[in-house]
Amino acid sequence: MQNDLIFCMNSYLTYRAIVDHNRQFAPGLTPWFYRHDVARTPVHTADELDRHLRREIQQALENGPVALMLSSGMDSAILASYLPEGTQTYTLHCHAQSSLDETGSARLYAERNGLKHTVVDIYWDDYARYALPLMGRKGCPIHSIEVQVYKAALHAKADGIKTLIFGETADILYGGHSQLLSRDWTLEEFTQRFAFVDVTKVLRHPQKIQSPILPHVQPDGNVDVFGFLNDFEYDVSLGFYNNACALAGMGFYAPYSSSVLGQPLDLDRIRRGESKYLIRQLFSRIYPDLPIPPKTPLPRPMAQWLADWTGPLHPELLPDHIPEFTGDQKWYVYALNQFLREFIGEENYAIPEAGACENPL
């Protein structure tokens, strides 16, 4: 394992993960890399997706007490319809003025299906308490959702639950990332678009890292974005949830993740506003009287919680542009800073000599 602090910082801010599995931040900080190595069932129609999800839920039920992480979105609402009456569900609720409250819609789905419903309240204090243990297990800074999932997993464990069920990867597998799929992107355009933080504004040694995207550059020079998401982002996103559940001693189950779209994604439909068209069809069949809910990310009100945060910063981080970042971008810088200060230290850490960085910016 190569010790490469500079690469790992750049990789995390760009992709929220260390993309080279032979590198680590520093000695003793071996990263935990997640790979979801399961057989994936090809799905062509809403009927096939329905049958697949029913089978997956039945398999989960055979392995002990389960609960569903239920949001206001289609993906978990569909899963709720397959669960036996009385099954426990949990909804995350961040206590911040700017946070979307999904509890009402989630409660409606729970009531429709005769399920128990519990709200897991999330506060900034939870981040102060749980972020560093999650980073320590992972050997890397974390995604902000990991703290929320970890608290929910602890709650579920106290309730006697063995496995938490998530709707994760439905967006990746069925065309939910409509903004990324909205147009064609060249390699350089997509590298800039996908990067979560502009490393030139944060790091003293910024690098351009394109290795996860390069295998998906097509002969015409454009990036196969759907292929990139199914390949790279699939494992990265599942890793967020798995790290949190594993630290809590909770089983993780994602029924969508063992499927794959069995035919080319209809980009024209996506670009006309019909994202996740197979999931839309299935949702409307299960809940014919309900409108298609708007796509919303899991709530994480970092714009409020980190509104005034500016440090103190580790020496490798630059302060000038932090105030202009979005809440989510501030989280990634904050998390990297916490990781560096706690696990790397502010003195006697290895930095490259001038000109030694790979692909410097």
Model-derived features: positions:
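Short, hydrophobic/amphipathic alpha-helical patches that form generic packing surfaces
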Residues: L5-I18, K151-L154, F228-N243, Q329-E346
